[in-house]
Design a protein with these regions (language model features):
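An extracytoplasmic/periplasmic, membrane-proximal ligand-sensing/linker region
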Residues: 39, 165-180, 190-204, 216-218, ...
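C-terminal lobe and pocket-closing loops
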Residues: 220-285
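Short, polar/charged alpha-helical segment
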Residues: 39-57, 173
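A bilobed periplasmic-binding-protein/Venus flytrap-type ligand-binding module shared by bacterial periplasmic
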Residues: 115-126, 258-273, 294-297
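Short, well-ordered beta-strand elements
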Residues: 26-39, 57-62, 152-156, 281
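A conserved helix-loop-strand patch within extracytoplasmic ligand-binding domains
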Residues: 103-157
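Ligand-binding pocket segment of bilobal, Venus flytrap-like solute-binding proteins
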Residues: 71-73, 79-86, 156-237
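Immediate post-signal peptide segment of exported/extracytoplasmic ligand-binding proteins
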Residues: 22-32, 144-152, 321-323
Length: 336
């Protein structure tokens, strides 16, 4: 073999090696917000496995919470992905960031059937099938005795510091609940709120208050959303119900605002991950019952999101294989 052939062969080999390296590293290094609640933690872990094993990304999970994560993505361009971003509190700012090309709302419905509002336990409706609306429930405070003042109905709200605490306190005034014989139950913490539901369910007692889906408790106890009637408009919600009490002089009763929950990504992810990564996140929609079922599994097994992600990928192939290419699915199955 002459020197020209040797050089040509070397160049061809080098070319294939370089191309292969580029292909494997095409996705690059990606950071995903590992939010501080179960469903978002689970979703982040699933995204990590799929993007790493299926598409060759180098994924790092970073601790996150709704507003700090959004601020960091907007100002610093990191983390690259917020799998479950509840956008109601920052919808204007998000729309601005999207219009400027800083962020992308890749998936505007990553989980079906989610939302916030008022809920009751199924046993309550079995005994009192007429209590399907907020108006009907508020006429019967006697059925939902306050734990510290049984002469009043107990209305369970969010812990201090949560955005929904403000909304529920304003709803309390809007629906004139005090006049109707109700009193707010101060739950104190997320554990306190969850514990009040579990205690009522296990004792066969009635419970009424705020909660949201997807969550393990909604799935475990089959909780039923209360019909709160019509939505009273954006101005009432944005400029009154969601504000501190001193900024909401005349709240109007309303259904809960539609929950805007997106998968949001930075422009860096769009450029680094390419069409395959973007296509995966666009297709990645969890059916509500499946998500609630996984959250129940996590609770029953005291499992973290990483454990749940493996369980999901092993047992729910009919769901997740629709999100990825055939070649990616094959790689992911092999990795499991």
């Amino acid at each position: 073999m002459n020197i020209k052939r040797i050089l040509l062969s070397a160049l061809v080999i080098l070319g294939f090696t370089s191309f292969s390296g580029v292909a494997n590293a095409a996705c690059g290094k990606i950071s995903i917000a590992n939010m501080n609640w179960a469903s978002a933690n689970f979703m982040a872990e699933v995204d990590k496995i799929i993007l790493e094993k299926g598409y060759g990304c180098d994924v790092e999970l970073v601790p996150g919470a709704t507003m700090p994560t959004f601020t960091s993505m907007q100002e610093k361009g990191e983390p690259d992905i917020a799998p479950e971003f509840w956008a109601n509190a920052a919808i204007v700012e998000l729309e601005k960031a999207v219009s400027e090309g800083k962020l992308h709302s890749i998936n505007k419905a990553p989980i079906t059937g989610l939302g916030e509002g008022w809920w009751v336990l199924p046993a309550t409706l079995e005994k009192h099938p007429e209590l399907t609306t907020a108006d009907a429930i508020l006429k019967r405070p006697d059925l939902f005795p306050h734990p510290e003042d049984p002469s009043k109905g107990g209305f369970h709200i969010c812990p201090p510091g949560w955005n929904c605490e403000l909304s529920n306190r304003n709803h309390y005034r809007a629906w004139e609940m005090e006049k109707k014989g109700w009193k707010i139950v101060e739950t104190g913490s997320a554990a306190g709120l969850d514990g009040s539901i579990a205690k009522a369910a296990e004792r066969g007692e009635n419970w009424f208050g705020y909660y949201w889906s997807p969550t393990a408790l909604i799935g475990k106890y089959g909780m039923i959303a209360v019909d709160m009637g019509e939505y009273a408009g954006k101005d009432n919600w944005d400029n009154c119900l969601s504000k501190p009490e001193q900024e909401c002089a005349n709240p109007k009763k309303s259904s809960w605002v539609k929950s805007e929950v997106f998968t949001v990504a930075t422009d860096n992810f769009k450029k680094s991950a390419g069409k395959d990564g973007m296509k995966y996140l666009k297709k990645r929609v969890y059916p509500g019952p499946v998500m609630n079922g996984m959250l129940v599994w996590m609770g029953d097994n005291q499992a973290e999101g990483a454990d749940a992600a493996i369980e999901f990928l092993k047992t729910q192939e009919d769901v997740w294989t629709k999100w990825v290419s055939k070649s990616a699915a094959k790689k992911i199955k092999k990795a499991l």
